[in-house]
């Protein structure tokens, strides 16, 4: 809970001023093809009819893009923006009259309570899993809502809790060790591949 005030104040300041909002939108992929670092999301999604995407813990950046390119045509993508602070974020957008998609309330740790099982093509979590109250449960829940052959895409700063001295939402670290994806803090340590073996394949970039 300690991080809520900081997050709300940060995004309010971004949306409040034209120059900060325009600066964010200049690097955002919103309005264009979905773009994820190290993963060709468009190529993955066009293999599926009517793909669905969840951007979980999205904040207010709209960074990933909301279209796919299929047969040379730019087509709208069914993408849902999800964050536990949705009520705060939607009020910020309304206050500053920004015309962006509404953010839906949802929590990674309980994703299957908000969305049907085996229905989603791609779940995106960027710089948010380490803010979760239970990162491994968030991974399990994300896998539960994915279709067979679906993808959970994770992209995070390395060991952010250590960098931020465990302040606010920064309670877990994520890193790569000997090719393994590890989630850890001072009290626990998890090898993600080991805990998802048998029902998920893991690629660490």
Model-flagged regions — what are they?
Residues 1-48:
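Class I SAM-dependent methyltransferase Rossmann-like catalytic core
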Residues 51:
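Nucleotide donor/acceptor-binding cores
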Residues 54-111:
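Class I SAM-dependent methyltransferase SAM/SAH-binding core
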Residues 106, 110-123:
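A short acidic, Gly/Pro-enriched loop at the edge of an enzyme's catalytic core
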Residues 121-134:
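A short SAM/SAH-binding and catalytic strip from SAM-dependent methyltransferases
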Residues 136-148:
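A short glycine-rich, Lys/Arg-flanked "PGG" loop and its adjoining helix->strand segment in the class I
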Residues 153-181:
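Conserved class I S-adenosyl-L-methionine
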Residues 174-205:
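A SAM-dependent methyltransferase catalytic signature shared across enzymes that methylate proteins
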């Amino acid at each position: 809970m300690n991080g809520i005030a900081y997050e709300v104040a940060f995004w309010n300041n971004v949306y409040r001023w034209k120059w900060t909002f325009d600066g964010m939108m200049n690097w955002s992929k919103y309005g264009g093809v979905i773009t994820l670092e190290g993963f060709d999301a468009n190529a993955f999604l066009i293999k599926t009819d009517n793909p669905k995407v969840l951007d979980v813990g999205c904040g207010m950046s709209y960074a990933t893009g909301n279209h796919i390119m299929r047969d040379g045509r730019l087509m709208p993508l069914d993408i849902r923006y999800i964050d536990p602070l949705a009520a705060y974020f939607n009020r910020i957008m309304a206050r500053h009259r920004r015309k962006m998609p509404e953010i839906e309330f949802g929590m990674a740790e309980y994703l299957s309570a908000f969305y049907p099982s085996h229905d989603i093509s791609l779940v995106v979590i960027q710089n948010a899993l380490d803010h979760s109250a239970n990162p491994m449960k968030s991974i399990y829940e994300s896998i539960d809502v994915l279709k067979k052959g679906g993808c959970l895409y994770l992209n995070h700063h390395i060991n952010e809790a250590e960098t931020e001295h465990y302040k606010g939402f920064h309670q877990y670290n994520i890193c790569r060790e000997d090719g393994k994806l590890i989630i850890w803090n001072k009290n626990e340590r998890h090898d993600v591949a080991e805990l998802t073996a048998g029902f998920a394949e893991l690629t660490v970039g």
